[in-house]
Amino acid sequence: MFYNYYSTTTIFAPQAVIDALKTDLKNRVTPIANDETKSWDGYELTAIPMYNLREEAKQFHTKGRGNGYVIEKDDMRVYFSGDTEDIPEMRNLKDIDKAFVCMNLPYTMTVERAADGVIAFAPKQVYPYHFRGQDGLSDTDKFKSLVDAADIDTEVIMLDWYPNNAE
């Protein structure tokens, strides 16, 4: 017998996402805005702003529309950047155990800016993700080299997010 996760799953999303959902799902989602924190089942979810800084990219992600997230449980803090650039809110994060940081042009940030941001908040581990852009894959080996060369204690973990990629 299968458990019905649909009826018990807690879903949080920014209002822009909720507005795009079909009514049956829309009514099940709790809105969460930038800088808000929600708690459920021993978890704490904090919405971190995500947005573009470069003038040519501001059309993709405006400040206040979307979220990255810090999820915390039992003293473990995990950050998901969402589609963002090297913004002050990311640089100012503290005590992050695992970070998932994007880098794909033109929608998010360059490899160099992603590395600079990670170096600023120095998570224990960082996973480059969401790095396939319009012109192929971002150079995650370069990202790893830049972070490894910094004087911080951050382990870069490379996962095969695109196993069927032809590149």
Report each predicted region and the residues it spans.
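Metallo-beta-lactamase
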Residues: V70-F121, Y129-L137
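Short, polar loop motifs at secondary-structure junctions
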Residues: A13-A20, A33-D35
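Binuclear metal-ion centers of metallo-dependent hydrolases, dominated by the metallo-beta-lactamase
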Residues: L25-T37, D41, A115, I119, ...
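Divalent metal-coordination and catalytic microenvironments
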Residues: L45, D83, A99, V126, ...
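Active-site metal-binding motif and surrounding structural segment of the metallo-beta-lactamase
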Residues: M1-A13, D95-F100
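Short loop/helix-cap segments at secondary-structure boundaries that form the rim of catalytic
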Residues: Y3, D19-L25, S39-W40, R91-K94
